[in-house]
Every structure is written in structure tokens, then in C-alpha cells.
Amino acid sequence: MLIAAPSRRRFMQGATALPLFGATSVFGADKPSAVIGRVLAMSDLHSAYERSAQLLAALRAEVRSHPVPHLIAIDGDIFEHGNVVSVRSEGAIDWAFLAALPAIAPTVVNLGNHDNDLTPDLHEVVARMRGLGITVLSNIVDARNGRPYAPAATELTFGGRRLRIAGFGTNSLNTYPKASRDWLSIPDPTQWANIQLPTLLDGADLTLVMSHAGVAGDRGMLSALPDGVLMIGGHNHLLFQETLGRGLYAHTGSWSNAYTAADYLSDGSVRAQSRTVALDGPADPALAALIRTTLNRHLTDQERVILGTSSTALSLGDTGRAVAAAFARFAGAQAGFIGHTTLGTGLSAGPVSRYAFDAVVRFDGKLMAAEVPAARLAELTTLANQDRVMPFARRTGDFVYGAVEGGEQRETVRIVTTDWCALNQHEYFGVTDLAFAEVPGPGVKAVAAAGLLKP
């Protein structure tokens, strides 16, 4: 039987990216409740130096313009081993950013899977953060001696109230730096949270839970959280908010493109707004100067080479779909897919250097193709493009950006993706039976650059 493959236009319908700015009021009320304190939350910064100074300025402006207690909460993945300047400078910009935060507001970090990218031993990372006056949380244990790298919970003064904070990470060991994996003992986050959180949060006044486990790890624990909790999620580079009774579960974006400003209200509820961090927005002068100096010192001529020009700026999701379409065209496929965290940030307009492009497409690799019955294409695209508005029940955490090319009728279709997604097809496509074969020729980055940029 001949089945028409979904057209690119049909596949893209409903895939409009979530706006990076928009108030989400958890509860409407005839009389507004007073704000008793605010949390400025962010995750997955990944040494995104193009916006680090703007983010720092935005956080300072938030605190100055709202005369209530504040907490800055970073939910993991501050550093990025794929950023050559970060590696060569030993994270000088990242550490300067962190050093500036406690002077703005009390700061807490929950460790993610990239926070030892530059310094493999997490004990050293935690000690340095504490030396800056930052509170560090984690449920990761040193497998060499059984010592926790940091406590899993703490309680801080929050104006006239007390804020209990718990933090935990992902147990996806293959996402941590290879040199450190034998030193890490990480429990299943859902099991750990369901056992430990009731005790850790018992008797708390106000509660904040920071998870770097991702949506898949978080889903099974949400119903066990206390009412009025603020839970910050990370790891998946997502931006959305989901109400939890009077509380809120929020993913805050990535790559310093956005942060979430959450208010604890006097009626026991939480509300939040997502804020964009504009590339051309106000920047902290000292950090901006350090960024310029550090880039000038550490970038090579090869990394400054202009690979091409982008005629327009693209959101992260639109960048992903454009790369997926480029894969499909190159491989003669009807559909292309790329894993969401293979990408870092959206493509900027204008000339794009090799260094800047490496922040767009983080990882190289092989292209892999498979032939599938046309009837299965809809099944495989179900989990794609989760940057769109969609029911929380359908969110999976890991996902692909996808594009379908052409609408001709055919019995089988050819799909193409990266070797990472092919290897981990259950996480990205929800199946395990796809038989992928390598696509000869250039790899992921070369094909993506050719598809995104003009000479």
C-alpha cells in the first residue's frame, strides 16, 4: 500500500517555539498576594560567553528593582569542555561570573554532568565554589571513598522566612567527563527523590527543589512533592512551566539565553516569568572586558576563520530543524533528525566563525541512515520538536529536532540522524529496532555548516 509521507509543512505545524518571555501565573486571585521572596533560576549555561555579561547585568537589575529577598539558583552545567576558550583559560570567565553572584544575592549551585568538565575531581570544583561564598548541593557520591561531594540539602534565611533547598543530578554516567566516571556513584534520581525528599523537606517553611536529572527522571517524583514547592529542572535544555497545585515545575532554558524569575507569594503559591537575555542587551562592564581579553588571548586564527554567513538569526529550535533538513538533503532522505543537546545555541545573523559555529553544533560525528515503512514516520516524529507548546505528559526530556522533506507517496522512507541518536534510539525515537548504516562522506558539523551558511 502506498502511504503519503507527511509534508515538511504539516510536520512543522504546531512546532512554534515557546516564547522566551511570558508570565505564567499559577493562581489568579481577586486581590494579589504579596511577594515574600524571589528565586532567579537558570541552568545549563555551558560557558556561553556571548551572553555571560548580559546575564550578569540582568540578574543585578532584577535584584535592584525588586526590594524583596532574592536567591540565585544555578541548576548545573556551568562549564563546557567543547568551548576551546573555556578549556584553555581554565574557565576564567565562568569563575569570574560565579564570583560576582554572591555580591548580588545568596547563590546556590546544584551540580550537573558538565560541572567537572575542566576540573575532573568534583571535590576541587565544590571547594572553589564554596570559597566564593556559593552554597553547593548534590547527591553524587565519591565512589572511591563513599564521601558525598556536597550535601543534598540545606536551609537558608530568606528574609523573615526559611527556604529549604534540595538538589540532585542525572545518573546518565556517559554524559559526565570520561576521566571522572569511575569516581562517581549516582543513584537513580526518581528512586532517590521518592525515598530521600520526604525526609529532607520535612517541616520546611518554603521549599526549592533543584534537579539536573531531566524530565524523564523528574516525572515520577512530582506527585510526592509538597504543595507550594518550586522545582527547577535542567539537563534537557528546555523552557517550559508546569503547575503543581500551588507550586511550579520549571525548566529555564539554556546557554544563557534565558532565566526564570520565580516569586514565592504570601498565599503559599509560586508564580514565575521567563526572561530572555538579549545578545545586544546591557552587559556587565567588567565581565564584558574580561570576555574580550580572554577571547583575544586564546582564540587561534583557525578558530576565527569565517565559515560562512547566516542571512537571519534562528531560534535554537529553528536551527535544529534547519540542520535536520540539511541532513535529509545531503543523505537523499525524506526526514532528518538531530538530538536536542547536540546543539548549543541558535544561529546568529551575519558572519559565523568556526568558534561561534562550535557553540551552535557542539558535537561532531557520523551521519546514520535507516529505511523504514512510511507508516512509521509519524511514530518516529511524535517525540520531535519539543520546543513547542505541548502537554507535559508527552514530554520525554531527550528528543530530536526533526524536519520532513517532500510529500511524495512511497512505501518506505529514508531517515537520517547522528550516530549518537542512532546509538541511543530508544531515548530519542522511543524505539529500538531501527537498523542504521553509516552515510559516507562528511560528518555532522560539515553537513550542518553547509546547510546553514552561505559562502
What name fits each language-model region?
Residues 1-2, 183, 367:
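Short, flexible active-site loop motifs that bind/organize anionic cofactors or intermediates
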Residues 2-22:
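N-terminal secretory signal peptides and thylakoid transit peptides that target proteins
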Residues 17, 68, 227-228, 332-333, ...:
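Short, well-ordered coil loops that connect the C-terminus of an alpha-helix to the N-terminus
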Residues 22, 59, 92, 388-389:
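A short hydrophobic/aromatic micro-motif that marks alpha-helical segments and, especially, helix-coil
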Residues 23-27:
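Hydrophobic membrane-targeting alpha-helices
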Residues 29-282, 318-326:
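Acidic, metal/ion-coordinating pockets
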Residues 36, 42, 47-48, 256-330, ...:
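Catalytic centers of hydrolytic enzymes
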